[in-house]
Amino acid sequence: MKIIVSEEIESVCPTFVGACVEANVVNTPYCQELWDEINALGEKYKQTLNTESLKEMSGIAATRKVYRACGKDPSRYRPASEALIRRMLQGKELYQRDTLVDLVNLASIAYGYSIGGFDADKFEGDTLTLGVGKANEPYEGIGRGMINIEGLPVYRDKTGGVGTPTSDNERTKMSIDTTHLVVLINGYDGDEQHVRENAEYIIQLLKKYCQSDGGSYFIYK
């Protein structure tokens, strides 16, 4: 897997650093131990954060700043990490999907980065390019139908968009049958050490909950 960061992104976020985790996995419908971790973190955040202070988490604040620089309102199109933590703080249940989706959500909540999880066998070609969404660019968000990604950072494969910090694409989404996983961590705050820690955390979660050796990761800028 090769990942290119376009000049469009470099111009609005010259310090961007990303990580790509790739692993062979076994997905399951539900994992109680994983949800125990998710719920424990939710309780911790309820003691330490509110819906305003969470916007100051480094990864979230930087992603919101990039949205504005690209012309997108981050209060209307919230980064997924912010939306997930906000839901927890409001006392709402997180949506339970399957172990891979739930695991990626936990990794995003724990570090504040918007993280995309993909079935790598559904990508077209072997290269992803991170750019900015165009006017009228077709994009079907998972469970959201067609969404307007103009001004959103977007990863594209040979066919089109596969992931934004707000919503990943139906075409390349993880499913219960996914065995070849790619996870992309978006460090718009430029904190390479924190991004690496997030990648290593994901590898540990995959070992614990997805019958995986954890795979490997690389940094891209």
Question: Residue ranges of each PLM-predicted region?
Answer:
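Charge-biased, low-complexity intrinsically disordered regions
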Residues: 1-221
